[in-house]
């Protein structure tokens, strides 16, 4: 039995049935990390000594009858490096936080620990979650386990790569404009971006506070649903966190879409979408129709303006959130300065990477007095129109189906020379964040064509978008599709 190939739910069940121990699961995972990390670079920090100590404690607790109802008891989990874990370095993949060690746990970490999960370490990401390739990390780029010449996506690229490379059973990521769904699509795994307010953001280092949301990445819909069930729920430490009627997402794991109304936005399948992606996504639509779902095309208005609106709003919020990193209280401080102004200037200039500086400059510009109405206010109006457009769509449909990305993963280095191309890679995902909706990305095929900037045999993902707090519908549809497919896995380097 290859332990690292099990799903998280299978692993936890075998631990409870005494077919293997928590320590064996943790050791098997760290063995995979040691073999593969030189090639993939999924992690920034690993936590082997403490993970093994936790494994021993969790094993004793399980044998004493605790965690009987937890689907994650004994499961090794990776955490994106912008989520605070007490006593563990949390860098946001930035020089400016290179040595920052939080004195507290994020709420999601407390909930994972309460469920008996084991924290493996912190995964690589785009600096401060600004990027969609995981190439802007101060600690170096992460490689896609399907092909190390290709990007894993971003900004949660380390989390997606770790799961795909069997270096973690589950990983937490964050999604501000597609940063869970896009790398999940590129790495051939499953990722859920929950409804805004479903999961507490307490302990998440902020990028754009009205858009950020924490969610799970795993190798199955079941593992994603189980993890989301554990980390969801109201939290007094996050005023934007909503108390929902139910967080029982595991009950949605049934193969039945009869009568489910699925909308296909025509605009998602127009110019700019790779032909192979279009083919596989439409095949999934045909499958749902065969299974008894009601599938119809429709026009989703205003989403063509989602990308520019998103980058105006997200950059504006980032310029405010990142103003706290000035070398005074914590984080990197320049060694040589003359006066407070020079301390600020040199610390920020030396501590932030180019992409972060670019977005902070955009944010400061659109918030300036001469351009506030021309850019920021207009972007907020577009955001409202997009939300209204989705509201009208969900009067007719239960879920919306489309591609996660315009194409499969490109080769490393392509986006760094063309930031606009990187921004446009989020064209199908950012509108979901602007509207605060839930969405899941799951694999639906592999690419066949290769060229100078892309390779054959790379995963293609589709996206299912739900109504606010409609996670159960998208999980049910995703699970139904998953049950009919034999998913290929990458040929990993050992």
Swiss-Prot record:
Class of enzymatic activity (EC top level): ligase
GO CC terms of this entry: glutamyl-tRNA(Gln) amidotransferase complex
Instruction: Quote the EC number.
Output: 6.3.5.7
Question: Which top-level group of life is the source organism from?
Answer: Bacteria
Catalytic residues at: 80 (charge relay system), 155 (charge relay system), 179 (acyl-ester intermediate)
Q: Which UniProt keywords apply?
A: ATP-binding, Ligase, Nucleotide-binding, Protein biosynthesis
S-S pairs? none
Query: Could you tell me what reaction this enzyme catalyses?
Result: L-glutamyl-tRNA(Gln) + L-glutamine + ATP + H2O = L-glutaminyl-tRNA(Gln) + L-glutamate + ADP + phosphate + H(+)
From the UniProt record, give one GO term of the biological process aspect. Answer: translation
Molecular function terms, GO-annotated:
ATP binding; glutaminyl-tRNA synthase (glutamine-hydrolyzing) activity
InterPro entries per UniProt: Amidase, Amidase_CS, Amidase_dom, AS_sf, GatA
Question: What job does this protein perform?
Answer: Allows the formation of correctly charged Gln-tRNA(Gln) through the transamidation of misacylated Glu-tRNA(Gln) in organisms which lack glutaminyl-tRNA synthetase. The reaction takes place in the presence of glutamine and ATP through an activated gamma-phospho-Glu-tRNA(Gln).
Q: Report the family membership.
A: Belongs to the amidase family. GatA subfamily.
Note the subunit structure: Heterotrimer of A, B and C subunits.
Its protein name is Glutamyl-tRNA(Gln) amidotransferase subunit A
Species assigned in the record? Lachnoclostridium phytofermentans (strain ATCC 700394 / DSM 18823 / ISDg)
